[in-house]
Design a protein with these regions (language model features):
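Compositionally biased amphipathic helical and low-complexity segments enriched in hydrophobic
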Residues: 7, 15-20, 589, 662-667, ...
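Non-catalytic all-alpha helical scaffold/repeat segments
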Residues: 173-658, 701-753
């Protein structure tokens, strides 16, 4: 039994008012932090969307972001300290009340006296035998009850102290985002952490049922930073890779069995817990992260065993990991792989019996987790901050002094064509493969996880966030693009459009991701396509506004090339076509044709939309004609299929956020978010887009296979833009604008714009 730090006399006369006052002070602090939350969030948003230049670009934003995160941690820690103090006060008050009742009431009633120091006695003089024995029994009982009260107090006192230590965290300079509601909860978390460590020390000796229990314990506390750090530090980096390698490779799990499910749950829960632990900035966890990275190239269990990278990357498939750790770990992993004199599959997939992964459809399809880069890419896809830093442009990829300034524009003609080494290696040079059963590695052009990581890096959004179920919540977060994500997008456009224009055709799995990226940068794409003249584009700066002046800087020609590359891919072609349609509707809704000036602005956006559509349509037609040169039937089937992007089913517009994004669904589960022009009306856009879908559905029956000639395909593309123009012209007429006498502008600009777009592709887009 724990020894109490409080004596009988101290407990009896303990002044608890100060403890109660401390709890109320923490409660007041919580309420103050709640009142300041909106200001803190606004500060973070302003910092994120501001255009930073000079040294501030790399210093201010990370600093402010960190302070906002610390603000949230401070609020959670303050609430936890309040809760623990309240609970602790209640426990001490209960012990004191029990003791007072015993001393002041129960003992005197039994003829027993308790001294100021807690000594129990009774006056036995002159008592008969039975009364004397009763008094002696009462002395023993009262003394025992005092001992029991002090014993419980000792336990409570130790638990309160331990809970407060857990709440304080391990870093004296940072707040700890713990979230305990009681002393008991903190004690259970600490006990569970110790129980988990005891179980994991047994490694592969654990039964299947024990693996299930271990996964439950970890999952229960996956978001508890104190629990997570206790487990991570207790295991140590070597213990982590030894444990998972032993579990994953030490027994034969069969898919569909409870044992397999337990292994998958354990992998996910352990990854979640380790991710939470890395979010701590304590010295101990920073050393842990460094040591884990350093042992990645070591063999687990000696020569012939799997590398540490394989075990840790399997655990990266779930969890919210610290961006610094992911960047350092990723650099070490790829450096080790690239230094290897041979194919990556020979380095990682040397043992066909090895399994490291049990998660997701990939495991069911045969992804045994023998490619550690996949786990890294999945983690980067969930962590945009890390992905953006991982794919940041090198020093040689410097902006030129061209227009606009600021921000500066990347000049693809300058002597700085080298993009991020990791980006180019993973996109076009690396050998990707799947581990399928006990067979040899199955080569693939590129893995989906790389597309997810690149999407996160270039847009600031975690992969997979734009779905029908999450759209409203995600769009409420606003436009996540920053100067840093835009510089990644510069490289993506340059790599896929200019440096390696056939790369997307060679890696079609990238089509949906690149189409989604283009959708989020549709404002910049329209700006650069609008004119090849710098002076003319200046007039379109407001029409195709970019958040806080930050703009992708690939210029007119490079943007045409990028669109051409996307147009050659069926999925990307459809996504760009749909994104352009919605984006232009947004621009039109923000430019109601109330006068000649407004009408001309709207017609300029329609003309640009026609050019964009002409570029991607021309690219798609030429690709289909080349690929199916000797099969006319397949050519017309492919053309009809590529023209049916509008078949997103019912309403194409799923939702819109107040921060200026709209989202459209796309067949196959992909989705695109599109920036809205300032002043755009999301409800109106949705209404018009749905009307467009209904109109096209009526004119083009949804048959199992639509066939279309090249001429019909181009006519359909031009008609889509003509629908935009007709909507706008009708709106102008309804406002009373005399198009013949006041504007003197011939309608049907979409025809000239569409033809010009096709010409642009033929001139520079191939």
């Amino acid at each position: 039994m724990a020894r109490s730090t409080l004596t009988f006399e101290e407990l009896l006369h303990l002044q608890l008012a100060k403890l109660d006052e401390a709890a109320e002070e923490w409660d007041l602090q919580v309420r103050r932090l709640d009142d300041m939350k909106d200001l803190a969030d606004a500060m973070g948003e302003h910092a994120r969307t501001a255009t930073w230049t000079g040294e501030n670009a790399g210093l201010t934003l990370p600093y402010v972001t960190e302070q906002v995160e610390q603000f949230d941690a401070a609020r959670r820690q303050a609430a936890t300290l309040r809760n623990l103090l309240r609970d602790g006060h209640g426990r001490l008050k209960y012990a004191q009340d029990r003791l007072k009742t015993l001393v002041e009431s129960d003992a005197p009633r039994a003829g027993v006296h308790v001294s100021a120091s807690g000594e129990v006695s009774s006056d036995l003089d002159g008592l008969d035998g039975d009364t004397r024995r009763a008094r002696q029994d009462a002395v023993v009982e009262i003394a025992g009850r005092i001992t029991e009260i002090l014993g419980v107090l000792a336990q409570d006192d130790a638990e309160i102290a331990a809970a407060l230590r857990s709440a304080m965290g391990t870093d004296p300079d940072r707040f700890s985002p713990v979230d305990y509601t009681s002393v008991q909860q903190a004690r259970l978390a600490r006990e569970d952490a110790d129980r988990v460590l005891d179980m994991m020390a047994r490694g592969n000796d654990l039964s299947d049922d024990e693996l299930h229990d271990l996964a439950l314990f970890l999952d229960l506390h996956r978001d508890d930073p104190a629990f997570a750090e206790r487990v991570a530090l207790g295991l140590g980096p070597q213990g982590v890779v030894d444990f998972w390698s032993g579990i994953a490779g030490g027994r034969d799990f069969r898919e569909g069995t409870p044992a397999w499910d337990s292994a998958a749950a354990l992998q996910a829960a352990l990854g979640d817990v380790l991710g939470t632990a890395t979010r701590s900035d304590s010295d101990a966890m920073e050393r842990w992260e460094q040591d884990m990275t350093a042992l990645g190239d070591d063999r687990v269990g000696g020569p012939g065993g799997p590398h540490g990278f394989l075990a840790m990357s399997a655990l990266l498939r779930t969890g919210d990991y610290d961006p610094d750790f992911l960047v350092d770990y990723g650099d070490a992993l790829l450096s080790f792989e690239q230094d290897y004199d041979g194919r990556p599959s020979m380095l990682w997939d040397s043992d066909p019996r090895l399994r490291m992964n049990f998660l997701g459809e990939g495991a069911q399809e045969g992804d045994r987790g023998r490619d550690p880069v996949i786990g890294l890419m999945e983690a980067l896809g969930r962590t945009p901050e890390a992905a953006t830093r991982f794919f940041a442009p090198p020093d040689g990829f410097s902006p030129s002094d061209g227009y606009p300034a600021p921000p500066q524009v990347f000049d693809p003609g300058a002597d700085n064509e080298q993009v991020n080494e990791r980006l180019r290696y993973l996109a076009s040079e690396r050998e990707w493969w799947l581990s399928t059963g006990h067979m040899a590695p199955d080569p693939i052009p590129v893995h989906d996880s790389f597309a997810d990581a690149l999407f996160a890096a270039a847009t600031g959004n975690p992969s997979g966030v734009f779905t029908a179920d999450t759209v409203e919540e995600r769009l409420a977060d606003g436009d996540m693009r920053t100067a840093d994500t835009t510089r990644v997008m510069d490289q993506v456009m340059h790599l896929y459009g200019t440096l390696e224009p056939n790369l997307l055709e060679e890696t079609p799995a990238m089509g949906a991701a690149l189409g989604a990226m283009a959708g989020l940068y549709m404002d910049d794409i329209n700006f650069w396509i609008s004119d090849d003249s710098e002076a003319a584009r200046r007039l379109n700066e407001d029409l195709f506004g970019s958040p806080d002046g930050e703009r992708a800087g690939n210029g007119h020609t490079n943007t045409i090339r990028f669109l051409g590359a996307l147009g050659r891919d069926e999925t990307a072609h459809g996504m760009v076509s749909q994104a352009e349609q919605i984006y232009t509707l947004g621009v039109l809704s923000a430019s109601p044709p109330t006068d000649e000036s407004q009408f001309l602005r709207g017609m300029e956006s329609i003309s640009t939309a026609a050019e964009v559509r002409g570029i991607v349509d021309q690219a798609r037609v030429e690709t289909i004609n080349t690929r199916y040169m000797d099969d006319e039937g397949e050519r017309i089937r492919q053309l009809g299929q590529s023209s049916g992007w509008w078949k997103a089913g019912g309403a194409a517009l799923l939702g819109a956020g107040a921060a200026g994004l709209s989202l459209a669904a796309f067949p196959g589960g992909a989705a695109i978010a599109v920036p809205l022009a300032a002043g755009a009306s999301p409800p109106l856009i949705g209404e018009l887009m749905n009307q467009f879908v209904d109109d096209v559905s009526v004119s083009s029956p949804d048959t199992a296979q639509v066939e279309m000639t090249e001429s019909q395909f181009f006519t359909a593309g031009k008609r889509d833009v003509a629908d935009l123009e007709q909507i706008y012209v009708d709106a102008a007429i309804n406002t009373g604008l005399d198009l013949d006498t006041e504007v003197r502008l011939p309608v049907q600009v979409e025809g000239a714009g569409y033809r010009h777009g096709r010409d642009l592709y033929e001139e520079v887009g191939r």
